[in-house]
């Protein structure tokens, strides 16, 4: 009995003009997700998904490449304007934002949504290099 061939389903073009770019920049990686106004993901990318490994994932250049890739995917769905939500303490925050702007998006607002504790959990120790 022959196994049925799995078909690769191509995603249809969504024609969404505005959305939200969530830039999550940690100490180890930078992840960019572009969603519509309801929060449904349109496109995503990360430094690790673009082939950077180890400590190179946390560089601003890796964040820039990931943001350019995510922007290209979102523009295929007709996206033109973005609100940007930046989260996290990593080094890829500004470079990802600059890459989204250079890709041709009109950025309407930039928000920092990094969670700040009101003296919650004990933070990890500071690195001594």
Swiss-Prot record:
Top-level taxon of origin: Bacteria
GO molecular function terms listed in the Swiss-Prot or TrEMBL record: rRNA binding; structural constituent of ribosome
Disulfide bridge map: none
InterPro entries: Ribosomal_uS11, Ribosomal_uS11_bac-type, Ribosomal_uS11_CS, Ribosomal_uS11_sf
One CC-aspect GO term: ribonucleoprotein complex
HAMAP family assigned to the protein according to its UniProt record, in alphabetical order: Ribosomal_uS11 (MF_01310)
Subunit structure comment from the entry: Part of the 30S ribosomal subunit. Interacts with proteins S7 and S18. Binds to IF-3.
Family: Belongs to the universal ribosomal protein uS11 family.
Keywords linked to the UniProt accession: Ribonucleoprotein, Ribosomal protein, RNA-binding, rRNA-binding
Pfam families to which the protein is assigned, alphabetical: Ribosomal_S11
TM helices/strands, residue ranges: none
Classification via NCBIfam families: PRK05309.1, uS11_bact
Organism: Allorhizobium ampelinum (strain ATCC BAA-846 / DSM 112012 / S4) (Agrobacterium vitis (strain S4))
GO BP term, example: translation
Gene3D superfamilies, sorted: Ribosomal protein S11
PANTHER family: 40S RIBOSOMAL PROTEIN S14/30S RIBOSOMAL PROTEIN S11 (PTHR11759)
Function: Located on the platform of the 30S subunit, it bridges several disparate RNA helices of the 16S rRNA. Forms part of the Shine-Dalgarno cleft in the 70S ribosome.
Record protein name field: Small ribosomal subunit protein uS11
